[in-house]
C-alpha cells in the first residue's frame, strides 16, 4: 500500500572516503618523520663541527638529481603514455564486443587522466631515488681534473676514465632504461587500446597493427639504437678494464678483435636505426625487423664468434708472446695506481748474499736495541688490569704503536687512551642519568716503551715481572720524564673515541652542561666536572630536545631535570665515523691511534681517495687485501666508499680532538687529482699540507691498510719482465701468521710497526715491515719496509733475497723454535695451568745482510678472572739456531749474538716506571723497581754491570732445578746486579 512517502537517497559516505585518504597519509607521515628528524639532527651536527657546507652541498646535489632524474623519467613516461592514448583507433571494428581488449580499453579510457598522472609520478619517483645516488659521479664530473698520465691504447688522460667516463655511462644507461620503459608502455598500451591485435590462426584471425603504433614503436626503437651506438663507443674504453686470468686490461683479443667489432657494431646500429626511422615514411615494419635480425646475427658473429676464434687459434698457442705488450701495460698502470712506481720503491737485489757476521749483527744497535717485546694485540688486558683505575674505563682490544724520542734516541711505544667503556657499566651505573650525564668521558693516556718490561719473569707462577713499564699513565701528565718525551697532557679528558662509541645498544651520546655551576660528571673519586668544550649540539630548547628524543627514542631527554638550558648532547663519537661524515668521499683506515698534540689527546685517522678502476690497473678488494689476524682481533673497521678499487692514495690525514670532537682534514698527497677534484666539490674543507704542525708530523704513521694493499700488489708487480710475469715463477706471497690461533692458521701475517735501522743510513727509523715468501713456498723471498719518519716518509724499501740461497721463512722459523726440546718441554709443563700466547713474530733484517726472528711468549693463569698476560720468555731464531730465555739478551747470546756489542744496550737509559702495581715493593722514591731489558728490554752498559747481570741470570737459570734456598740466593744476586746496573746507567 502506498504511503505517500519516498525513501530518502543515501547520504554520501564522506567519512569513509576521508578515512581512505587519511590512512595512507598517516603512513607517509610516519615514514617521513624519522627521516626529517635525522636530517634535522644531522644538520645540527654538521654545524657543530663547522662542516655544514658539506651537508648542504650533498643534500642540494641529491635533491637536484632527484628532481632532474624524476622529471626526465616522468616526462618520458608521460609522453609514451600520451602518444599511445592519442594514437588509439577510433573504433574497434575488428574486435568481438566481448573481447577483453574492449573491456581494457573502456577501463583505460575511463581512468586515462589518472593513469597519465600516476604512472609518470611513480616511475619518476623511482628514477629520482636511483639517480640521486649518483651524486658523487656528477660532482666529480663537474670538478674533473687531469692526471697528466694517459692510457697506452687511446692516449686519453686518466682523468677521462676517472671522472668523465662514469658520467657518460650514467647518461647512456639512464636513457637506455627510459627508452625501454617507453617502448614497453607503447607496446602494452597499443595492445590494450586496440592498436595491436594478436592473430589467432585457428580462428582465422590475422594479427594487425595500426600505422600510428608502427611509427611510435619504430621511433622509440630507433632512439634506443642511437643510444646503443653511444654505448658501443664507450665500450671501447671499458675494454681497458677487462679482467683476465693473468692480468687486468685490454688483451690481445680485446684490442685486435673485440675493439674492431665494437666499431662495426656501432656502424650496423646506425644503419638499423635509420631503417627504424624509415617507418615514419613507409609505415612498414618488415625492413627494421629484417635489419634487427641481421644486427643480432652480426653481433653474434662479429662480437662473439670472431673474438673466440682468435683467442682459440691465434692467442692460446702463443699467449706469452701475444700478451707480452699488454702485460707490460698492466704492470706500468698498476704500479702507478697503487703508488709503487720505481721512484717510490727501492729494490735491494741479492740482499744478504754475503751474509753478516754475528759481531756486525750485534753492533746493529738501531735494530737490536729496539726489539719490540710488547705485542699490542696481546697486552690490552694487561693495560686494562693495571691502568683501568675504574671498572667503567677501558682500552681497545688492539692497542696502537707510536714513537717518541728518549735522550736523543728514537723509541717505539705502545699507546692507548683511557676511554669510558659504556659496555662495562654495571647495575645502577647503567641508569639513564648515570650513563648519559655522569659517566660521560674517559681520562688520560697510557704509554709503555715497547722494548721494556718492569723486570724479568723467571717463573711462570710468579706475580713479579714481565709487565709493561708505563712511562705515562696518570690522568694529567706533567712530570719531568713525560715532558722530555714531549708528552704533556694539559687536557686529559676524552669525550670522543672508538671505545666510548662502541655501545652495543647504539646509544652513543652524552648530555653535558649544567646550570648554577653544579657539576655532575664523574672526573675523579674526589671531584666532578662540567664540560667546557665547544663540541656538542645545544638541546636547551624544546625543538632540539624533542628531535633528539625521537632520534634516540628516549623520553628522558624531554622529562629529565638533568637536561637544562645549558645542556649539549655529544654524539657520533667514533673518530673514524666523524671523519667519514664530514668527508663522505674518503675511505678511512681500519685503525685510529691517539697522540698528544699541543697538550691534547688527538685521534689520527688516515683517509684514502679511491677509484674503482683505471685503464690496465689491477683491481683489488680492500677488505680482502687488508685482512689479517690483527684485523680479526681489533674492534675497528674501515669506512668504505667502495670495496673494489683500482686506484688508491693516502691523500688526507685527519685529526679528531678527543675533548671537543673537532675534525681537521689535512692535504697529504698534493699531487692526487682525485683529492683536487673533491676539494673543488667541497672548497675550504681540506687544509693545506703546510698547515700540519711539526709536532703532528712527528706522529704521523704510514697507514697499515695502504701498506697491506701495496704489499699484495708488490707480491706480483715487483716483476718487470712481461714473460716472467706470465709464468708466475717470480711471484711472491704474503705468509700466513705462524703465531695465529688454530682457527686463523691461513690468515695473513700482519705488518708490524718497529723501530729499526734505516735501510740507507742505518739510523733508528720508525718503520712498518712485512716479509714475503716464495709463491707456494715457505722460504723467505723478500722483506718490505716503509718509513714513517718525516724526512723520508713513504719511502718503500724491498730487500730481495738471492734465489740461489735458502733462508727460513716465518713459518719455518716458528716450526724450528717450537720443535726445540726446551720450548716443547716448558709448554707441556705450563699449558695445564696457564694460557700461552705467541706474540708478534718479527722478521728483522740485521747487520745489513742477515735475518733475525724474534717472538715474545706470554702467559696468563687459567681460570682466574683477574689474570692478565705477562712476558714470560723471548724466542729467537738466527741462522737456523734457536734462542730461548727470559730476556732478549740471553736469547741473543744463545744464537751467537753478543748483546754487549750492541751500542745502545750500553748507552741508552731506561725509563723510570710509574707506580703501576701496588703489590710490588717500592724503592725510596715510591716507585716499583725496574729491570732494564737489555737484559729484558735493550738497556744497560758495556762494562761490568751488564756482565754481572748476565752472570746472575746464568746462576738463576742453573738454580731453577735446585732447592728453593739456592733459587732465592740467585734471585737476590740478580737484584743486586740490577741495582748496580741502574746506578751505573744513572737511573
Curated annotation (Swiss-Prot):
Keyword Oxidoreductase applies: no
Segments traversing the membrane: 19-39, 63-83, 115-135, 176-196, 212-234, 261-281, 290-310
Source superkingdom: Bacteria
Membrane topology classification: Multi-pass membrane protein
Entry keyword Transmembrane helix: yes
Chief location: membrane
Residue stretches of biased makeup (Low complexity): 928-943
Region entry Disordered, spans: 904-950
Ranges of Basic and acidic residues composition bias in the record: 904-927
GO-annotated cellular components: extracellular region; plasma membrane
InterPro entries reported in the protein's UniProt record: UPF0182
Keywords: Cell membrane, Membrane, Transmembrane, Transmembrane helix
Subcellular location: Cell membrane
NCBIfam families: PRK00068.1
Similarity-based family: Belongs to the UPF0182 family.
Name of the protein in its database record: UPF0182 protein DIP0733
Native source species: Corynebacterium diphtheriae (strain ATCC 700971 / NCTC 13129 / Biotype gravis)
Lineage: Bacteria, Bacillati, Actinomycetota, Actinomycetes, Mycobacteriales
